[in-house]
Amino acid sequence: MLGVVELLLLGTAWLAGPARGQNETEPIVLEGKCLVVCDSNPTSDPTGTALGISVRSGSAKVAFSAIRSTNHEPSEMSNRTMIIYFDQVLVNIGNNFDSERSTFIAPRKGIYSFNFHVVKVYNRQTIQVSLMLNGWPVISAFAGDQDVTREAASNGVLIQMEKGDRAYLKLERGNLMGGWKYSTFSGFLVFPL
């Protein structure tokens, strides 16, 4: 007697026409989607007869990387919000980085990776940069050596985000006048939840 999974697979194959992988580990591509057949709970089925199904599409890819391409003085807007703005987007797969606000908006619940590198130049003040999640600081980095002409505040983290959550960089302390060039802000979806 056929189980639900076997009937689903037969029904899908019948609707899509013939689709064969060369071996059991190759995915079967049906109408642009990748159908992956795997054991959904290997510890509960020592015989290896249970099957689980996972369907993924290319739209699951999420990544961005933005930089400051020029030195400039902070704008009136950035002086009010203290958000660090990035004027050149190098990568924006999924279009979830809002370049006007320099804010990443999570398209789905998942684990995300973020890293930043904010450079201060010829500035004797200590700077503190924070990665903000919905207005709350998650991690911070400092650059405060008064004897060097260039120094960076850098950090990275994995965080769980819900759909619609916002992440951005905020200057919590100091100023970046005269040296934003070479600063970067990047992130990507590690895996959805």
Swiss-Prot record:
GO cellular component: extracellular region; glutamatergic synapse; parallel fiber to Purkinje cell synapse; postsynaptic membrane; synapse; synaptic cleft; trans-synaptic protein complex
Region (Necessary for interaction with CBLN3, and homotrimerization): 62-193
Entry comment on modification after translation: The proteolytic processing to yield cerebellin seems to occur either prior to the secretion by presynaptic neurons and subsequent oligomerization or in some other location after release of the mature protein. In the cerebellum, cerebellin is much more abundant than [des-Ser1]-cerebellin.
GO molecular function: identical protein binding
Region described as Essential for interaction with GRID2: spans on this chain: 122-147
Tissues in which the UniProt entry reports expression: Expressed and secreted by presynaptic neurons, such as cerebellar granule cells. Following secretion, the protein binds to GRID2 on the postsynaptic Purkinje cell membranes. Expressed at the highest level in the cerebellar cortex. High levels are also seen in the olfactory bulb, posterior part of the cerebral cortex, certain thalamic nuclei, and deep cerebellar nuclei. Low to moderate levels are detected in some hypothalamic and brainstem nuclei. In the thalamus, expressed in parafascicular nucleus neurons and other regions (at protein level).
Essential for interaction with NRXN1 and linker of two C1q trimers into disulfide-linked hexamers: annotated span: 34-38
Pfam families recorded: C1q
Keyword Transmembrane set for record: no
Domain C1q: 57-193
KW Mitochondrion (keyword) present: no
Keywords, ordered alphabetically: Cell membrane, Disulfide bond, Glycoprotein, Membrane, Postsynaptic cell membrane, Secreted, Sialic acid, Signal, Synapse
Signal peptide start and end residues: 1-21
Single biological process term from Gene Ontology: negative regulation of excitatory postsynaptic potential
Listed PANTHER family: CEREBELLIN-1, CEREBELLIN-RELATED
Role, per record: Required for synapse integrity and synaptic plasticity. During cerebellar synapse formation, essential for the matching and maintenance of pre- and post-synaptic elements at parallel fiber-Purkinje cell synapses, the establishment of the proper pattern of climbing fiber-Purkinje cell innervation, and induction of long-term depression at parallel fiber-Purkinje cell synapses. Plays a role as a synaptic organizer that acts bidirectionally on both pre- and post-synaptic components. The cerebellin peptide exerts neuromodulatory functions. Directly stimulates norepinephrine release via the adenylate cyclase/PKA-dependent signaling pathway; and indirectly enhances adrenocortical secretion in vivo, through a paracrine mechanism involving medullary catecholamine release.
Protein name per its UniProtKB record: Cerebellin-1
